[in-house]
């Protein structure tokens, strides 16, 4: 019953050290298996849980840059197999507008490189920002103004960084008033600029809190496939 893939994690393609050509084929397979439905690909997240703590401090800035350019180039090439606009790129770890502009510069460089090589590619992929920390939430409008086509709010991370809690501590409810206010601010920034927004990073324990987000205007949710029917049932019973 899902309308698309809201967040495709790609840490495995980097950890496995796939070449650019291998990444292109991997993304093409995902596009083919999606049956024409939209796919939002989150670029490699150096802070992702499945990267392991051993990654901390090991990767240099140059390695990060090389990894990013290789992945973006592969995505732009694979996108020629998707319906127009069906493959979207979501950038994590964006704390401010400067970080966003760095990603846009990388997209531009990949575009120019692929043109020089004469390879088929899609040069106008929709690009979005993953809102994970309060700083990004407060600057959402400026990030959109700098070129973001859509926003995704990582609820799990936003709760952690807003409330100053560790995942090892007693879980903080996702509908914490401070979190709701931040999400509402992000919603306002997106709505006034005509940009789509959705929630992701929704843990099983937080499903029952989703009506609170629906009441402040959120209409799109990204959850693990096993939770889709449960979330639908909860939302259908919500009184606005």
Model-assigned labels for residue ranges:
Residues 1-240:
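Conserved alpha/beta-domain cores
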């Amino acid at each position: 019953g899902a309308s698309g893939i809201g967040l495709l994690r790609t840490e495995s393609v980097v950890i496995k050290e796939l070449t650019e050509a291998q990444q292109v084929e991997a993304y093409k397979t995902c596009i083919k298996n999606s049956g024409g439905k939209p796919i939002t690909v989150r670029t490699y997240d150096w802070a992702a849980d499945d990267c392991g703590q051993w990654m901390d401090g090991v990767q240099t800035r140059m390695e990060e840059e090389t990894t990013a350019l290789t992945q973006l180039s592969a995505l732009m090439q694979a996108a020629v197999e998707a319906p127009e606009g069906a493959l979207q790129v979501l950038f994590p770890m964006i704390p401010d507008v400067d970080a966003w502009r760095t990603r846009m510069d990388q997209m531009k460089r990949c575009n120019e490189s692929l043109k020089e090589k004469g390879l088929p590619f899609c040069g106008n992929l929709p690009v979005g920002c993953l809102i994970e920390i309060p700083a990004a939430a407060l600057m959402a409008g400026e990030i959109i103004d700098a070129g973001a086509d859509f926003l995704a709010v990582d609820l799990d991370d936003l709760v952690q960084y807003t409330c100053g809690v560790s995942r090892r501590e007693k879980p903080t409810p996702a509908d914490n008033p401070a979190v709701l206010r931040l999400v509402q601010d992000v919603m306002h920034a997106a709505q006034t600029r005509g940009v789509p927004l959705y929630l992701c990073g929704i843990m099983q324990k937080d499903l029952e809190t989703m009506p609170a987000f629906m009441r402040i205007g959120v209409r799109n949710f990204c959850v693990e496939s096993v939770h889709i029917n449960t979330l639908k049932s909860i939302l259908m019973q919500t009184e606005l």
